[in-house]
């Protein structure tokens, strides 16, 4: 039978009475997709009917209603405006082993939230430029054409003036912050911006993320409205405390690729630098001026495109480029950005040749070789080579060399000097046995049941299926279940991303 999400049972009046609280925390969970298996349905991208019924009921019964989104990506949040009395929403992501404790600390006020969205959350699914091209929606499960070109995520929403539900870089806090531009400088190819960040609140400590965006001039090459070039997170600031945050980016971060001559270039014009705390809450803080085109890198075409994909283009002048303007909309922002004198914004003239041009040469690929590798390669048959490339998958006795593993390369070539590589199914190590025992015959068995139904089996059967926990030869295979990439990036620490 097809897998069904465990949406949960109906919440009853009896549950409300037993809870003895005025606050309800309702968690919405979805698994990540793979192999084009996600569907645009109310049960996957949106609420299941039982979830909608439960949310409506709980919002009526409790004074405070918190919704936690335990999903690895975007989710349809239209219900926030359709169901009254929902007070707060937390994007949990998929945080791994300590995720529950982290959310509890946030809800209880032990820590102040400081994460920032790494994706733009649209009001409607069709607001995404590639919405109709995804998976089965265009009838093609085998090929995906990236027609968005450079207009991906916030670069699309900001350029095409599509109002998102939550913009890129957005995230609320229990306190309020103020950013004050302290200065901007240019040293060779490094642009440096200093920003004083102050916690204006009176109760909570908190952290803020300073974000730098640059609007590049349109020329022969079309540009997005703005691009993120740098970000930095403050320390935990106490109420009234202030910290100077220094951010840097390189002029090479402003280049664009020109396909016709395989060149990376800076086109002439004004590069407008912005500071803020999301892509929709920025102020102009400086201008970089370039008089003539600057080529920074030269490449060569080595792979001919098999077909030409018609990419999305923005034909009008970008409104966000006005040097004395800003990009601010009311997203319940908790950060005021102060520029003392908009009329005296610093400008810097970029000198020709400030970036040395680099020519890339693509010669024959260097292949590592030694007597040992030559001997191994000469011993391989055509079948051996095919098996080495394709891998052994999840079938055959070799799969059980690490019980519960997600796949192997191949264990059939160990006699020829090629070891078998056994893989876990992601950081969570799904199905992977933490402890296994090795018998005197070399057979490996997991010590603990990794499937729940096994605990109901008769003891003699379990004894045959499982390894001996008292064996002197035990193998340990632990996994961390660390947060998924979107959750790590949301922390906004550069050393994590």
Model-derived features: positions:
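C-terminal non-catalytic regions of proteins with extracellular/luminal or membrane-system context
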Residues: 1-417, 422-492, 496
């Amino acid at each position: 039978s097809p897998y069904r999400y465990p949406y949960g049972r109906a919440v009853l009046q009896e549950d409300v009475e037993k809870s003895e609280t005025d606050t309800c925390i309702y968690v919405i969970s979805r698994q990540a997709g793979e192999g084009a298996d996600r569907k645009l349905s109310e049960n996957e991208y949106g609420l299941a009917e039982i979830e909608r019924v439960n949310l409506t009921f709980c919002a009526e019964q409790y004074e405070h209603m918190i919704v936690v989104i335990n999903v690895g990506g975007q989710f349809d949040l239209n219900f926030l405006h359709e169901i009254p009395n929902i007070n707060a929403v937390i994007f949990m992501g998929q945080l791994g082993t300590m995720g529950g404790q982290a959310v509890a600390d946030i809800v209880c006020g032990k820590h102040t939230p400081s994460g920032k969205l790494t994706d733009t959350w649209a009001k409607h699914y069709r607001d995404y430029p590639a919405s109709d091209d995804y998976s089965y929606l265009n009838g093609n499960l085998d090929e995906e054409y990236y027609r968005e070109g450079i207009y991906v995520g916030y670069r699309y929403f900001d350029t095409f003036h599509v109002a998102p539900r939550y913009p890129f870089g957005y995230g609320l806090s229990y306190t309020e912050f103020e950013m004050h531009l302290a200065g901007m400088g240019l040293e060779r190819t490094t642009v440096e911006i200093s920003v004083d960040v102050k916690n204006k609140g009176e109760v909570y400590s908190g952290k803020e993320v300073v974000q730098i965006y640059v609007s590049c001039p349109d020329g022969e090459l079309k540009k997005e409205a703005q691009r993120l070039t740098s970000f930095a997170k403050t320390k935990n600031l106490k109420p009234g405390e202030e910290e100077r945050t220094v951010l840097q980016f390189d002029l090479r971060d402003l280049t664009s690729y020109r396909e016709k001559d395989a060149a990376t270039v800076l086109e002439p014009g004004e590069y407008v630098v912005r500071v803020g705390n999301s892509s929709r809450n920025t102020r102009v803080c400086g201008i970089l001026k370039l008089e003539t085109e600057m080529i920074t890198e030269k490449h060569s075409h080595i792979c001919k495109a098999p077909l030409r994909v018609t990419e999305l283009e923005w034909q009008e002048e970008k409104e966000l480029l006005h040097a004395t303007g800003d990009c601010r909309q009311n997203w319940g922002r908790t950060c005021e950005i102060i520029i003392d004198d908009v009329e005296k914004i610093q400008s810097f003239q970029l000198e020709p040749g400030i970036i040395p041009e680099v020519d890339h040469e693509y010669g024959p690929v260097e292949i590592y070789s030694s007597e040992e590798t030559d001997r191994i390669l000469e011993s391989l048959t055509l079948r051996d080579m095919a098996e080495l490339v394709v891998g052994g998958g999840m079938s055959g006795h070799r799969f059980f060399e690490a019980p519960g593993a997600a796949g192997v390369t191949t264990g059939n070539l160990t006699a020829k000097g090629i070891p078998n590589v056994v893989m876990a199914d992601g950081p969570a190590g799904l199905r992977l046995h933490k402890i296994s025992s090795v018998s005197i015959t070399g057979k490996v068995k997991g010590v603990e049941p990794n499937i729940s139904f096994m605990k109901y089996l008769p003891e003699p059967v379990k004894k045959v299926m499982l390894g001996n926990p008292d064996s002197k030869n035990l193998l340990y295979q632990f996994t961390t279940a660390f947060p998924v990439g979107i959750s790590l990036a949301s922390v906004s620490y550069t050393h994590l991303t």
